[in-house]
């Protein structure tokens, strides 16, 4: 039966070709219907003419394919009861076409089969849409009962075959012309059938044609999508019947391609220009080897329909979704929503909607023409796709879509060949970004010229997705500063966006580019549109960096950046692995290393040390060799670089030369050597110091190790990660380091460069500034890894902590140096730390939410200064601290000066440095250095805030000081580490410029003193700002305020242990004095809640140390003065990151939840001022220390705050204001109070809206995000600040 029918079909198709081309549709229609009436149809008996064969088939298809047939038939919303089945036309719905080798074909279904039952439901009289829905509902399983009608061939059949076949279905029946009602069409069809039957001479092909005419061709939306199995176009001759009827090939995945004859004949019949369906189908999927021309011919019904007069929009609706395409079809229409594929070809698996080109073959495969005609045009021009054939852009777009899409399939979008071949085009395309409507695949369109068929997916109006080239991929994207390591912090746009980029970039790439030279163009070339975007971002970063550099803060803190920026050398010291050695880049680094990093033997303990020491000597070589014996353990890792044998920085074990860490070290060493030569001393050692700070990508850290392993050549490996990995691998080395860490002070320099949120610039500062710096770098390296690797980190942290306790013992001031270390990592919970500090992107993060002080967590690695303070710090005998203090006391100020050789190698010197930092104010010459520090610190803060060099996310600046963490440990407050949400931690102690370090250490000392006092104090004491301790210089006080912001690491718990503070008498005395003072202050605070904090700033209590202020202060020497939050002797829980920023402070308010932390958050202080529960977490030391009598500090804070980029947590930290609202419960506030409160938060810009909306204190607690947005607080940072402040208020 099949054979005769096929023959008939073939003959009829041939005949059609001969006969019908000259006929118009109307002529054919007239012929078809002129002789017959419905009555005649009904009366006519074709039983003799037709052989009826019924069969039931079960179709099982895959999700990504269709059933392989195109259903066609009368369209009606309800069953057409008037329809009387006849042998010749037993049902309304029939198979217009069946894909060869498709599911239906294999089940025995053939073109012309009438569908009588679907899933055991009778559909003889059911309309097309309902049947299609039934089929769809069946899912991948379909049971069909079909009737195959075969005409008996009479002797005269042969002759009849040559007779003109009945006209193709009337235009009325044409899907495109849906003008006629179903009934009228049915009638006509019936007439046709009747006539056919009457004259048995009508061939089977004629009957089939009539059937087709009878049935309104309707695309089987879902069924088609179900994807009739796509198959190569059948020769026109093969499908005469199909040719007669407009074939609705399923556009769905399988995309049956209507036989060319079918489509052509169908189009001819319809009088529709044949537009190749945009999505020819093939079982194999979108990749059809079919030439474009073929595809065009195969255009889906929808394409044809539009020609008929249906709009492309309509066609889209008409066309079944392209879901079935193997590539994008799997994605439902969502593909339309999917952004266009990147300019670069996407990976071979085409994205669901790689581009408009991928627009589903929907009725009108919407090319760009449909959605983006402009784009389509561009595409059309770019790719001489047959689209030209389509007159309208939509058609062209569709054609292009086919090609592009197919190309995308054929050539993986990622395929380099395609991309390269089209690079210029894409480049042009990118250059024409204004035209971005163009599909990035327009290039693909050219590929399309290759004849690849790409099913058109629905075009997405949204901008095309451009494949984001890896930041690492484009050197230009990479910070001009070569940062072999991928240190890209989330806010890669951090103050030194470049650095963040550079960090991600390979060092070599960076070498070619200077800091300021991000080459967006190149990246564009590489990535296309995305590259362009990145380039723009890079440019912005560059601008930012320039501004930062120009700003005073940059001069003080960003010198390194400047140096780096100018240096064309690929190395970006900041971005280099934490290892200073990574910076071994330049003499600058060497100078830095010498002065700022201690070449302490600790090198072994820290990768940094190794690198640093080598830096000092021969940045690369010396680094490897210089590390002294114990340090050589780490140094071997680095210095061994030359020999190929590396010591694990943490464990001190020899690394397998092939291990990722060893490779990374080797690469770093090589880079260092290279860098050393090119940039021996690009600028002052100070600048080198700035460069020296390592950008630690805490976020990337975990991956960095792998990356480093993968990229042995990347100097840019994050040392921090390396150290982290080192720490993780070997605890033994960690132990060594721990011992060393004790001596080591890690300063995190403010580097405006480190604007990138993710980057932390870690300067390790030993007791001796210069050496300290080196050691600190090492430790920084050590510590950061511990943060990264919890277990290894703990050990280093313990070590660090041990050192910290020593410092604490030496004197509270000693803590300042250490503070950075402590602040960065909590000794006990390295893991937590990484998440403590809000990622840079979230400048305003609620500390309360993030920090539950019940269990202080270390700041997130991003924000951690990669300082691990060993929990053991608390274990350090107070005597040692006292000794350190004494030593420091004796030479308290040498540390400020950077003497590369100053006992930097000796742990003792480090201790001394720490001690001097920690020394009580009485012990230190804090005033002198303090002044310097304050100036430089403030300057840094200001410039930083103003230019936001470091802190694009400056708002999230938090002063993280180990001081707070170690507060109870003996006031061994590490220098305050200002950690920015950016993830940048800046230690005031070690300013990029030596003067700052001097000043900062002093500040630290002063702070340490206060911190110690705070340590002694209980939370209640902290709640109240201490009366300004006379010893603290005003500038120091601000630093303390910042300290308040510092987030306390778990060290706080240790501090608790230390709290007993078996400190040398000086420290003990100081602590006792401070405790008494704090107690008094607490009482005073209770009495005058707003006084202490308010007076300094008038904005926020110093204790609040608004983030901006604190951050600034932190950046400035004040950072060093990070307030140490004392943990009540009973409180083991370290306060985590209280110094963070106002944000952190706010969190501290949240911290209050965990009373254990002694530190009172600024908000808490406010509360205290308003006699609030002292049990609330103590305000940051800065709060306590900032005395009402310290207006200067307040000024500093005010300046800092003003400079802070945006209302930062510091702002949020509710400065205790003299305004009435500060004394009233929030629910008692009036509109004016709310407005004043907003002003105090530096959010006065929203004052009017709040006033206009009559927002009073009763409304504030209930304000939701949507409410704030309605009130005009559209900036996330502002909302967060408000929410934070509200939390503080509510917690008071």
From Swiss-Prot:
Positions with biased composition (Basic and acidic residues): 719-743, 941-952
Keyword 4Fe-4S attached: no
Region (Disordered): 155-176, 331-393, 488-508, 604-656, 671-743, 774-811, 938-968, 1087-1115
Broad class of where this protein is predominantly found: cytoplasm
Coiled-coil zones: none
InterPro entries the UniProt entry points to: PDZ, PDZ_6, PDZ_sf, SAM, SAM/pointed_sf, SHANK
Gene Ontology CC terms: cytoplasm; dendritic spine; postsynaptic density; postsynaptic membrane
Annotated ranges, domain PDZ: 56-150
Molecular functions (GO terms): ionotropic glutamate receptor binding; SH3 domain binding; synaptic receptor adaptor activity
Occurrences of domain SAM (ranges): 1229-1292
Compositional bias annotation for Polar residues: 375-384, 604-623, 1098-1115
Cellular location(s): Cytoplasm; Synapse; Postsynaptic density
The keyword Cytoplasm is assigned to this record: yes
Biased composition (Pro residues): 338-354
PROSITE patterns noted in UniProt: PDZ, SAM_DOMAIN
Record field: compositional bias (Low complexity): 355-365, 492-504, 953-968
Motif SH3-binding, chain ranges: 991-997
Function: Seems to be an adapter protein in the postsynaptic density (PSD) of excitatory synapses that interconnects receptors of the postsynaptic membrane including NMDA-type and metabotropic glutamate receptors, and the actin-based cytoskeleton. May play a role in the structural and functional organization of the dendritic spine and synaptic junction.
Name of the protein in question: SH3 and multiple ankyrin repeat domains protein 2
Biological source species: Xenopus laevis (African clawed frog)
Lineage: Eukaryota, Metazoa, Chordata, Craniata, Vertebrata
